[in-house]
Amino acid sequence: MEFVLFMGEEEGLLGSKSYVKQALRDKSINKIRFMLNYDMTNDPKGYSATTDASKSLFLAIGGLAQSIDTSFRNSFRSGAGLHSDHQPFMLQGVPTGGAGGGSLPNNAGPCYHADCDDFKLVDEKGMQNTVRFNAMLVYGLADAPAIEAKRLTDQETKDLLLKSNLKEPLQIAGEWRWKD
């Protein structure tokens, strides 16, 4: 289990890209079983992953979370997306996931990345739930006898990105590495 804080997300995922570049170089990428990303997570109501491969495991962990606190709805969402620190991992086929489904508190949305952003916009209970429910996910993954999600091959990664309509945005960003 490794906890990492990345810098430079807003400047182009600088920290996570650097991490993945080094992990490819030293082959440690092969040891990464899951990259759980927590960006704009508040009072999550369920878990998410890039693919459905670990849906049953995530729902089992979520069921335990829900039995402790019924505000956790134990929803599951799968899909590939861009523009957060999971992206460099996903582009290398590493399973990614996290939690979500909550909403930003205190009308914080308009202040995201704006001058009006302020610590008073943070909701303490939502932050506590973020930590609790995500700690349950991390513990559940670490304690699982098996994790169905495996690192995707290069072709499987390409297919996932095509299915998710991410080729064009990745081409625009200069990050589509496959030859057609």
Residue ranges and their predicted role:
Residues 6-109, 175-178:
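Metal-dependent peptidase/peptidase-like ectodomains
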